[in-house]
Amino acid sequence: MELIKQIFPFANSEIITAAVVCFSMTLFGLSLGFGLLKVQGE
């Protein structure tokens, strides 16, 4: 977290938290979608 604040000194914690949540939700959605495709493909 401190490393991110050093790279982006202008970004406050709310923006960083929102970005991390959106990024993790996207990764979760992609992995879930690929899992469903694999199950349906079998």
UniProtKB/Swiss-Prot annotation:
GO terms for biological process: photosynthesis. InterPro entries: PetM_cyt_b6/f_cplx_su7 (IPR012595). It is a single-pass membrane protein. The 4 large subunits of the cytochrome b6-f complex are cytochrome b6, subunit IV (17 kDa polypeptide, PetD), cytochrome f and the Rieske protein, while the 4 small subunits are PetG, PetL, PetM and PetN. The complex functions as a dimer. HAMAP family: Cytb6_f_PetM. Component of the cytochrome b6-f complex, which mediates electron transfer between photosystem II (PSII) and photosystem I (PSI), cyclic electron flow around PSI, and state transitions. This is Cytochrome b6-f complex subunit 7. It comes from Phaeodactylum tricornutum (strain CCAP 1055/1).
